[in-house]
Amino acid sequence: MTLVNAETNNIPFSSGEPGHFYYHQWSPENPKAWLHIMHGMSEHGARYREFAKFLSSKGIMVTAGDHRGHGITGQSMKSSYHIADNNGWEQLLDDQRELIKHIHSNHQLPLILLGHSMGSFLAMHFCQKYNSALSNQNAPQISGLILSGSNYGSPSTWRAALIIAQFERWRKGFDHSSTLLEKMSFGAFNNAFKPARTESDWISRDHKVVDNYISDPHCGGPLTTQSWCDFLTGMIELTNLTALAKINSKLPTLLFSGQMDPVSNAGEGVTKLRDTLTKSGMGNVAMHLYPGARHEA
């Protein structure tokens, strides 16, 4: 297949705020579908380049934005690793809605969402809020949902974590990071891979992927305490059964993860997520665990 404008990086998208949002796009000739990626915490959309180029060669257009506080967007807004001063999670959701509407205005294609790690929660929450409403806002219906490297925690678990994050926000300041929160969130992830080659071995079994992550200035930085508070508030809203039941029950959904992913406790969390989505009423949920794979399967 001949590729036309196969890769366009750092496309500015005005938000009406200081700085710009930026997204990346991989476009084949005559695309038959559109995959939109919501990336994870402390990374950025351009990391999905090789995956996107592969899909583009198969006729699928791929887009991936850099969230607030992340990648070129965070750099442009002078807020790297700080999502917002308040209501950051809601702003991430609204950003995705506006970006999808913007891209759809030029490409009327079936839309599949792929969310990785934090982005998987963002994609689920997006489907709760906007799946039925998008068609009334000059945007596409969502045709499929893919969740990578995800997990499940009960609302009570997230509430307990939020109390600690709020204390750290009071102690450190809203726009500062917290070593305690970082250790609580990521500190044990490498334990299963000792003796570890790096502190980021849990990311992938592919040494090149890990090394690129470590050397990338837009990866691995600690979020601010306010960003943690906003994220955890979003998790509380997302994970109760009443909220999950708002996702289109017929939406085809695929969960995949590494069988050794510490984020989901070696697949336990993503299995719980599948069961919870099914219990909430979703009738078309599949799951696959990749043997030997880690967080980025």
Task: Mark where each language-model region is.
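Conserved alpha/beta-hydrolase "acid-adjacent" motif
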Residues: 262-272
